[in-house]
C-alpha cells in the first residue's frame, strides 16, 4: 500500500498538468509571473514526486543515474504535453516551455537526492520520502 501511495503524487500532478494544459489560455488562471517560471516550478515538483518511485538505496548508490532517469521521464512527459497543447485551440507548443519542463525535472531530481542524502545523514529511517 505504501508503494502505491508514494506513486500517487506524480500521477496526480501529471493529471492536473494535463487538465490545465487542455484549456485555452483564457480559461486557465495564470499568475503574473513568466510562464517559464511556472513550468520550471511545476515540473520541479513533478520531478521530485517521481523520485519517490525509486528505492532509497538506488539514490544513495547511483544518484546521477537516478537524476537522469527522473529528468528523462519528466522530459518525455513535458514533450507529450507540449505536443498535446499544439492541438488545443488557443494554445501552442513551445520549445522554451519544454526546456523549462526539463530543467524543472532535473531540479526536482536533485532535490529528491538531496532530501534522501540529508535523511540518511541525520539517521532517519523509513521517513516516507522515498521507497525503502
Where do the PLM segments sit?
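Bulky hydrophobic segments
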Residues: 1-89, 95-98, 102-132
